Amino acid sequence: MKTTKKIAVITGANRGLGKGIAEELSNTNNITVIGTSTSQKGCKIINKYLKNNGIGIKLDITNPNEITKTMDFVYKNFGRVDILINNAGIIRDKLLINMKTQDWNSVLNVNLNSIFYMSKSVIRNMIKNKQGKIITIGSVIAHIGNCGQTNYSAAKLGLVGFHKSLALELAPKGITVNMIAPGLIKTGMTNNLSQKQLSKYLSKIPMKRLGTIKEISKITLFLISNDANYITGQVIHVNGGMYMP
């Protein structure tokens, strides 16, 4: 199964942004995509759209031992990992006064700790090959805050410091480390918003529209290309002007 194509691991590839990014990469025909999901149902979805351009693998990204076993399988069957895209994430929204410890811990574990586990699982191989791309999907919420999302914003902003430090560690090895921070993107979740809710969100976006999954996947494609070899330690904001650093 080893191939001359680049090997990309994408977490949470069964729906939303992860699915869109995985499809974009697989359509280049020079990237084999390994998409992860927490369920067998999700893996079937991944296998269906990837066809011969990759596979879906069931993986709990909060379990270091499971990650080790999965990555051993990847290295044995594909030889290496050239690209890691940390996309999977969850929300457990509540005002802090009502937030349970479990709500806090679960979001920090999936949205922050798992990125440590996944990144650590690939960097030794990338260092050996003297090249690699690590990209993590962040959020505009990390930079502007949002009521009911202290856990989510803390995790996503924590990733910024993590990636800047990791970028410094890996830059001499030829490995780039970057983040994409989307604003409000049109997904299944936003399709369920009422017109009143949608209008409220759009009032905060100067471009007066939602972003698209395609726009995020195209930026991801650029960041993993050789055209972005001199870009590292950056957060690329894609939010229609909602936040301007």
UniProtKB/Swiss-Prot annotation:
Ca(2+) 1 binds at residues 51, 54. Ca(2+) 3 binds at residues 234-235. It comes from the Bacteria. Transmembrane segments: none annotated. The active site is at residue 152. One of its GO terms (biological process) is fatty acid biosynthetic process. Signal peptide: none annotated. Disulfide bonds: none annotated. NADP(+) binds at residues 12-15, 38, 60-61, 87, 152-156, 185. It catalyses: a (3R)-hydroxyacyl-[ACP] + NADP(+) = a 3-oxoacyl-[ACP] + NADPH + H(+). Substrate binds at residue 139. Gene3D superfamilies: NAD(P)-binding Rossmann-like Domain. SUPFAM superfamilies: NAD(P)-binding Rossmann-fold domains. Ca(2+) 2 binds at residue 146. GO terms for molecular function: 3-oxoacyl-[acyl-carrier-protein] reductase (NADPH) activity; metal ion binding. Homotetramer. Catalyzes the NADPH-dependent reduction of beta-ketoacyl-ACP substrates to beta-hydroxyacyl-ACP products, the first reductive step in the elongation cycle of fatty acid biosynthesis. Calcium ions stabilize the structure, and may inhibit FabG activity by obstructing access to the active site. Belongs to the short-chain dehydrogenases/reductases (SDR) family. This is 3-oxoacyl-[acyl-carrier-protein] reductase FabG. It comes from Buchnera aphidicola subsp. Baizongia pistaciae (strain Bp).
